[in-house]
């Protein structure tokens, strides 16, 4: 039986509720492995994983590397600065070169939306999207979902408020797709200048007030203000942004008493979140990091083990 019929993980779009549940269940098993004294398995022994990062990353690249090594894979890291990359042709040339090395999986992070899908069309191995421009970041959404499910026991019928720089966030897009697929109620809270056009068509409720948007929320997911992606005046000032859209202890009171506080990292303390909240009892930010390794272990094992289990879809969805 083919439990996960996809060859690649390019995005959440294209995954069914069953696909997502399968990956989360598999990740739950990986958590147990990560908490053992002996963490290394031989599941992917003899297989090769190449991490190809065109954007600088610390936590995501380290998480993918650790995931592969805990499964026994041979892991190779390639960091390529965007200054030396001519998008498109160079990506294809790089793909051809790496494909000739016969890896089993390529993990790619790139500043251009669609880069992972393009790579998947050019190579014979599996491709995992570690973030492509403002498009998607599927493993982040999966690790967020795992964190929520382990804390709340479910994903359906919970209220999740995604707050901050939604416009520039691939994390927000992937989380919206996943949470909607799993039956959650999703809100976005942000100034109009930080919301993409047509956001309401994604099946979310839109709020411009933190107090209103957080009312009765089960989860408060803060997003980093991505000033490096801003070419114009999206916010009057950082100070004013924090005043209206930063999460501090007082603002958090609008949510449920047991609401989870999440952040994909890296955090801008004092910009979108106060230290008292980030380090407070409702924060599960550290748990998100732990779940990231487990989710990426689950994805690697699922894609590589499923290669010999029958036909799989080739679409960009997954």
Swiss-Prot record:
MF GO annotations: amino acid binding; aspartate carbamoyltransferase activity
Residue numbers binding carbamoyl phosphate: 59-60, 109, 137, 140, 265-266
InterPro entries from the UniProt entry: Asp/Orn_carbamoyltranf_P-bd, Asp/Orn_carbamoylTrfase, Asp/Orn_carbamoylTrfase_sf, Asp_carbamoyltransf, Asp_carbamoyltransf_Asp/Orn-bd
General function of this protein: Catalyzes the condensation of carbamoyl phosphate and aspartate to form carbamoyl aspartate and inorganic phosphate, the committed step in the de novo pyrimidine nucleotide biosynthesis pathway.
UniProt-annotated binding residues for L-aspartate: 87, 170, 224
Transferase keyword on record: yes
Annotated source species: Rhizobium rhizogenes (strain K84 / ATCC BAA-868) (Agrobacterium radiobacter)
Pathway assigned in UniProt: Pyrimidine metabolism; UMP biosynthesis via de novo pathway; (S)-dihydroorotate from bicarbonate: step 2/3
Gene3D superfamilies: Aspartate/ornithine carbamoyltransferase
Pfam families in the record: OTCace (PF00185), OTCace_N (PF02729)
Reactions it catalyzes: carbamoyl phosphate + L-aspartate = N-carbamoyl-L-aspartate + phosphate + H(+)
BP terms from Gene Ontology: 'de novo' pyrimidine nucleobase biosynthetic process; 'de novo' UMP biosynthetic process; amino acid metabolic process
UniProt record similarity statement: Belongs to the aspartate/ornithine carbamoyltransferase superfamily. ATCase family.
EC number: 2.1.3.2
A cellular component annotation (GO) from this entry: cytosol
Keyword presence, Repressor: no
Subunit structure: Heterododecamer (2C3:3R2) of six catalytic PyrB chains organized as two trimers (C3), and six regulatory PyrI chains organized as three dimers (R2).
Top-level class of the enzyme under EC nomenclature: transferase
Keywords carried by this UniProt record: Pyrimidine biosynthesis, Transferase
Disulfide bonds: none
Protein name (database record): Aspartate carbamoyltransferase catalytic subunit
PROSITE patterns recorded: CARBAMOYLTRANSFERASE (PS00097)
């Amino acid at each position: 039986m083919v439990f996960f019929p996809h060859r690649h993980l390019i995005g959440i779009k294209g995954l069914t509720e069953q696909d997502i549940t399968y990956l989360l269940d598999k990740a739950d098993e990986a958590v147990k492995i990560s908490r053992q004294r002996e963490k290394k398995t031989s599941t992917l022994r003899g297989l090769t994983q190449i991490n190809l990062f065109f954007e600088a990353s610390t936590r995501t690249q380290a998480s993918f590397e650790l995931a592969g090594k805990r499964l026994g894979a041979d892991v190779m890291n390639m960091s390529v600065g965007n200054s030396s990359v001519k998008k498109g042709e160079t990506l294809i040339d790089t793909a051809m070169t790496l494909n000739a090395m016969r890896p089993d999986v390529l993990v790619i992070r790139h500043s251009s939306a669609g880069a992972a899908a393009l790579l998947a069309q050019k190579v014979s191995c599996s491709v995992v999207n570690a973030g492509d421009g403002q498009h998607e970041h599927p493993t982040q959404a999966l690790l967020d979902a795992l964190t929520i499910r382990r804390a709340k026991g479910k994903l359906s019928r919970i209220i999740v408020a995604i707050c901050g720089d939604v416009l520039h966030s691939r994390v927000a897009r992937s989380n919206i797709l996943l949470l909607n697929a799993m039956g959650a109620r999703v809100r976005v809270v942000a100034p109009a200048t930080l919301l993409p056009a047509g956001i309401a068509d994604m099946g979310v409720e839109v709020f411009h007030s933190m107090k209103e948007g957080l009312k009765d929320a089960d989860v408060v997911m803060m997003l980093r203000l991505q000033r490096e992606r801003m070419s114009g005046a999206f916010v009057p000032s950082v100070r004013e942004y924090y005043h209206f859209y930063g999460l501090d202890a007082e603002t958090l009171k609008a949510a449920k008493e047991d609401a989870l506080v999440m952040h994909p990292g890296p955090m801008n303390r004092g910009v979108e979140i106060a230290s008292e909240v980030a380090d407070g009892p409702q924060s599960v930010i550290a748990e998100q990091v732990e779940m990231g390794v487990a989710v990426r272990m689950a994805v690697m094992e699922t894609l590589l083990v499923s290669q010999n289990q029958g036909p799989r879809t080739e679409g960009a969805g997954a």
